[in-house]
């Protein structure tokens, strides 16, 4: 009556269970290696819970799925910056992401947010490059150029350490 219920011994079954637990615990490190030399894993599909960024009942103030190791603070070797898995920087690789303000020269004093607002402005003298410009277009363009030069000089004066102060008085 005594038949073997399992084709393997209980010790072998325990060993297989330990291997299975070890593989499932190492699975995130297998698909996202910590060092960039161990493989290019940036284009791999993320798991569902990796798409949530600090979401959940017990995640108040906690980074739940971040992996800490010696190389970087978040376990990824992506140029030493914080890599948020919920916002993959390679998701728009096939779509051109250059905007109009990206094509402006680097010597321009506008910051990126100012450039975005510069592009969105309409109905002002910044919209002079449209074809429906009025007759006094050259005068308005000259006024705009003068105001930009004045703004650049003001910015240079702000960035210079303790230069001459300008006092403006208004006479009534």
From Swiss-Prot:
Signal peptide annotation: 1-26
Keyword line: Neuropeptide, Secreted, Signal
Principal cellular location given in the protein's record: secreted
Keyword Signal: yes
Keyword Acetylation attributed: no
One GO CC term, this protein: extracellular region
The record's account of how the chain is modified after translation: May be processed by convertase egl-3.
Subcellular location: Secreted
GO BP terms: neuropeptide signaling pathway; sleep
Function, in words: Neuropeptide-like protein. Plays a role in behaviors associated with a sleep-like state induced by stress (SIS), acting in concert with the FARP (FMRFamide related) peptides, flp-13 and flp-24.
Record protein name field: Neuropeptide-like protein nlp-8
Classification lineage: Eukaryota, Metazoa, Ecdysozoa, Nematoda, Chromadorea
